[in-house]
């Protein structure tokens, strides 16, 4: 699980908030199967509206230009982002995301990673935590507006009931060029180490050796 900060700037978050106030919202169960529908109580932006098209394009632009997101996800395909909101009493019980999903005209994609981009500051609502279960236990996530959490789509997860205010977010899925979570995590850690060493010492012989190792591993594990 990775915390990706500052996907949106403060000004961009404010603009999203302004536009979300004008959105047309529908029952969030329209995008899930029977298992998810039984535990899902929220609202989503109507994907047939021009406003939705603008907002999802803006999120995609921000993600494609964010180096840390690219390093952590190694995206081959990013789904069209969706937008949800939870008011008082609304929640989404524990569930697992589908292994594959239809991604518009692009066709089917495998869901290796799930991502939630928070669009409200945590002080503006109570409850509404994203709870993610993995082999190390439960992780409760409630990030600042404009920050994103990235986690394996195979994880059981839920959104706890909102008790005050409104929680708004964008959510999406990624098919990675590297399918295996452990391999992808190793590449991410190696890339972060390389970037840190480059910042301190420049492109020395040791850094170039690590960079060579990174690309050889990427070449071995990538599916394109």
Swiss-Prot record:
Domain Fe2OG dioxygenase: 77-176
Residues binding Fe cation, per UniProt: 95, 97, 157
UniProt keyword annotations, A-Z: Dioxygenase, Iron, Metal-binding, Oxidoreductase, Vitamin C
GO annotation (BP), single: intracellular iron ion homeostasis
Positions contributing to 2-oxoglutarate binding: 167
Superkingdom to which the source organism belongs: Bacteria
EC annotation from Swiss-Prot or TrEMBL: 1.14.11.-
InterPro entries per the UniProt record, alphabetical: Oxoglu/Fe-dep_dioxygenase_dom, PKHD_C, PKHD_hydroxylase, Pro_4_hyd_alph, Pro_4_hyd_alph_FE2OG_OXY
Alphabetized GO MF terms: 2-oxoglutarate-dependent dioxygenase activity; iron ion binding; L-ascorbic acid binding
NCBIfam families named among the record's database cross-references: PRK05467.1-1, PRK05467.1-3, PRK05467.1-4
Protein name: PKHD-type hydroxylase KPN78578_12210
Species of the source: Klebsiella pneumoniae subsp. pneumoniae (strain ATCC 700721 / MGH 78578)
């Amino acid at each position: 699980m990775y915390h990706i900060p500052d996907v949106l700037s403060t000004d961009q978050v404010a603009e999203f908030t302004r536009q979300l106030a004008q959105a047309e919202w529908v029952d969030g169960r329209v995008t899930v199967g029977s298992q998810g529908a039984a535990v899902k109580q929220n609202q989503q932006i109507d994907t047939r509206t021009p406003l939705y098209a603008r907002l999802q394009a803006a999120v995609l632009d921000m993600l494609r230009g964010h180096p840390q997101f690219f390093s952590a996800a190694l995206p081959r395909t990013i789904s069209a982002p969706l937008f949800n909101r939870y008011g008082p009493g609304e929640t989404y019980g524990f569930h697992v995301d589908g292994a594959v999903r239809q991604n518009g005209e692009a066709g089917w994609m495998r869901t290796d990673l799930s991502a939630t981009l928070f669009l409200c500051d945590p002080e503006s609502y109570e409850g509404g935590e994203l709870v993610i279960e993995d082999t190390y236990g439960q992780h409760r996530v409630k990030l600042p507006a404009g920050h994103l959490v990235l986690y394996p789509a195979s994880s059981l997860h839920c959104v706890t009931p909102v008790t005050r205010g409104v929680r708004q977010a964008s959510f999406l899925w990624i098919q990675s060029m590297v399918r295996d979570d452990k391999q992808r995590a190793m590449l991410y850690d190696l890339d972060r180490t390389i970037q840190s060493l480059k910042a301190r010492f420049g492109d020395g012989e040791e850094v170039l050796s690590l960079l060579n190792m990174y690309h050889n591993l990427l070449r071995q594990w990538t599916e394109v």
